[in-house]
């Protein structure tokens, strides 16, 4: 099971074996790094992708096939640990112990998957009202650079993981090391690390590591689900970087690119991860995924492919960040399959629908207001605009994880109070209250109104 290096192309190594042919995805050791077999070239030649730095490797170096795919050790010892995408410790502690599991598990059978029928309360008004999260489903947070995806993920971890007190897994895929450090500190200080496993494949890692990190995180989440049952939370920041790493690997392997330079297997690669996130009889995995949108183009092939797998989609708007509305959730583009009378109740659906109607009409009137002013509007339209602006202000909310920067204490708003607050605005009960009184507050009672 030994061969040698016959070619080096950055993170791609070509190997030659004489009496053995490695299988697809088999791990091979070259010096002190692992490489993964990704293409069989014939006559004992294979093309591999490195899972570590290739500096210093020479042609002729020995390669040893390990006879197994990428595995990660799972067990109770993982709780509270910070690991790399290949399972190595990043928290200056010893190597984790436990049962080795392949990261390439098969998704559950169709008949084993349970339907998603209950809502997960987040305490964030814009999300709970307009894009309620499903328990045991998949949620995507879409947005370009700098619109607040990571902050929103951190707030969700704070609100949901602390309140939920079950086990959670965080996968940092292709993001900044600084953000990973900040998140680790935040989770440690809040006590969430006692119920959390963190797995990082950061942006400085080779594409092979970034591409394999979501598989490792999904494997740990599946283990926790089977071992402890209940609900497991799986956070991914950023799932787009997984698709991007796959594009890099595909290009390095010499495959013909498809639209926008993406790998031809983009759809199936995304499905391999997404289809493993499900509700089963033994427990459920609820996944929250940040999705970077290149150049704010939601029709880009990667976000568009990910979108098709989601139960709830939250779109973050740059226009809202420019006017200081945080979280910058676009109420007209965000949606959820949970917004159904049989799931959340008729009152919730009606209030959410009317909120969207007010905001949509306000968008249509903006050009007229800019040209002619509010005075030229009919009394009915003027009323719509005033209430829509108050709705927009009330959609803002101070976050716990941003307290150090904003100076405002974070607020958690129960779902029932969220619906009551927006209903009061659209019914005109706050017509006498100035817009500013609704900006960056939690419960509607903070505006001085009892509803």
Swiss-Prot record:
Transmembrane segments: none
Class of this enzyme: translocase
Classification via CDD domains: ATP-synt_F1_beta_C, F1-ATPase_beta_CD
SUPFAM superfamilies (alphabetical): C-terminal domain of alpha and beta subunits of F1 ATP synthase, N-terminal domain of alpha and beta subunits of F1 ATP synthase, P-loop containing nucleoside triphosphate hydrolases
E.C. designation(s): 7.1.2.2
Keywords: ATP synthesis, ATP-binding, Cell membrane, CF(1), Hydrogen ion transport, Ion transport, Membrane, Nucleotide-binding, Translocase, Transport
Matching InterPro entries: AAA+_ATPase (IPR003593), ATP-synt_VA_C (IPR055190), ATP_synth_F1_bsu (IPR005722), ATPase_a/bsu_AS (IPR020003), ATPase_alpha/beta_chains (IPR050053), ATPase_F1/V1/A1_a/bsu_N (IPR004100), ATPase_F1/V1/A1_a/bsu_N_sf (IPR036121), ATPase_F1/V1/A1_a/bsu_nucl-bd (IPR000194)
Tree of life domain: Bacteria
Binding site for ATP: 143-150
UniProt-annotated location(s): Cell membrane
Gene Ontology CC: plasma membrane; proton-transporting ATP synthase complex
Topological type in the membrane: Peripheral membrane protein
Chief location bin: membrane
Role of this protein: Produces ATP from ADP in the presence of a proton gradient across the membrane. The catalytic sites are hosted primarily by the beta subunits.
Subunit structure: F-type ATPases have 2 components, CF(1) - the catalytic core - and CF(0) - the membrane proton channel. CF(1) has five subunits: alpha(3), beta(3), gamma(1), delta(1), epsilon(1). CF(0) has three main subunits: a(1), b(2) and c(9-12). The alpha and beta chains form an alternating ring which encloses part of the gamma chain. CF(1) is attached to CF(0) by a central stalk formed by the gamma and epsilon chains, while a peripheral stalk is formed by the delta and b chains.
Family indicated by similarity: Belongs to the ATPase alpha/beta chains family.
Protein name per Swiss-Prot or TrEMBL: ATP synthase subunit beta
Source species taxonomy: Bacteria, Pseudomonadati, Coprothermobacterota, Coprothermobacteria, Coprothermobacterales
Name of the coding gene: atpD
């Amino acid at each position: 099971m030994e061969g040698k290096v016959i070619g080096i192309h950055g993170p791609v190594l070509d190997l030659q074996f004489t009496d053995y042919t490695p299988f697809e995805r088999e791990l091979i050791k070259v010096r002190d790094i692992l490489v993964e077999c990704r293409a069989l070239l014939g006559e004992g030649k294979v093309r591999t992708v490195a899972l570590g730095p290739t500096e210093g490797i020479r042609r002729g170096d020995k390669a040893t096939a390990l006879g197994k795919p990428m595995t990660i050790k799972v067990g109770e010892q993982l709780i509270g640990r910070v690991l790399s995408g290949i399972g190595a410790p990043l928290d200056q502690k010893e190597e984790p112990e436990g049962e080795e599991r392949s990261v390439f598990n098969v998704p559950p059978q169709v008949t084993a998957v349970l339907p998603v029928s209950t809502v997960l309360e987040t305490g964030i008004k814009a999300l709970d009202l307009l894009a309620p999260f499903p328990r045991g489903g998949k949620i995507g947070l879409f947005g370009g650079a700098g619109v607040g995806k990571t902050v929103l993920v951190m707030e969700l971890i704070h609100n949901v993981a602390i309140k939920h007190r079950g086990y959670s897994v965080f996968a940092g895929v292709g993001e900044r090391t600084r953000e990973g450090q900040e998140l680790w500190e935040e989770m440690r200080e809040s006590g969430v690390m006692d119920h959390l496993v963190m797995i990082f494949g950061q942006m400085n890692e080779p594409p092979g590591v970034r591409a394999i990190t979501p598989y490792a995180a999904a494997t740990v989440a599946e283990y926790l689900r089977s071992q402890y049952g209940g609900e497991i939370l799986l956070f991914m920041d950023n799932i787009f970087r997984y698709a991007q790493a796959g594009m890099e690997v595909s290009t390095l392997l010499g495959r013909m690119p498809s639209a926008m330079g993406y790998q031809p297997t983009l759809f199936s690669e995304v499905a391999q991860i997404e289809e493993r996130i499900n509700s089963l009889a033994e427990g459920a995995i609820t996944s929250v995924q940040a999705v970077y949108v290149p150049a704010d183009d939601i029709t880009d092939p990667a976000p568009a492919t990910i979108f098709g797998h989601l139960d709830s989609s939250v779109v973050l708007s740059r226009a809202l960040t420019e006017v200081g509305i945080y979280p910058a959730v676009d109420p007209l583009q965000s949606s959820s399959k949970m917004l159904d009378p049989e799931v959340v109740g008729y009152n919730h659906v009606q209030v959410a629908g009317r909120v969207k109607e007010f905001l949509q009409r306000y968008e249509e009137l903006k050009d007229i207001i800019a040209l002619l002013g509010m005075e030229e509007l009919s009394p009915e339209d003027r009323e719509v605009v005033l209430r829509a602006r108050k709705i927009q202000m009330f959609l803002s909310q101070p976050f716990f994880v941003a307290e150090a920067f904003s100076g405002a204490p974070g607020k958690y708003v129960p779902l029932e109070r969220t619906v009551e607050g927006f209903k009061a605005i659209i019914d005109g009960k706050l017509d006498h209250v100035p817009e500013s009184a609704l900006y960056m507050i939690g419960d509607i009672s903070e505006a001085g109104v009892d509803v």
